[in-house]
Amino acid sequence: MRNHSNIFQPFVGERPTEYADRVGRWYASTVTEPHKKKYGQYLTPIPVADFMASLVDPKGPAVRILDPGAGTGVLACALCEKLSSHPVKPRAIALVTYETDRALIPATTAGLDYLKTWLVAREITFTYAIETKDFVQANARALDDSQGTFSQIASLEEPFDVAISNPPYFKIPKDDP
């Protein structure tokens, strides 16, 4: 990805969700339609991300979130913003994301770094990890677990409190590993 520091500079008062959306729209304008199709890329509209976040109500001092198809982090940002405004907001949020498009990682990192700064200003500790692999392929064995326990998820150091995701935007063949 080319360095466009003016694109990656947050505006004063900009919500992390708005920033991630803006960076995502810029990135989408730099890649071809076949590229977007290959990676199943779809920009989640901010109102949809906000609605999805509004459905989550985890309680506790720490929240662990999974975003298995992060993109630039619009869904994760919307969820973290929502949690930060909860009457009993968490003191710590840990986010594990998966993103297969390595060219998108600088934009993902920019969005999550801005989210971290935004949350720290609200006295919430924020950590994140970006896994550059396919969540389904990396966790196929656990996802096929007949017990439904997901006990073998690769990033499962401890259970997740919430997962936020769009469906995949490409068809997965039946014989896919």
Functional labels for PLM-detected ranges:
Residues 1-177:
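SAM-dependent methyltransferase catalytic region
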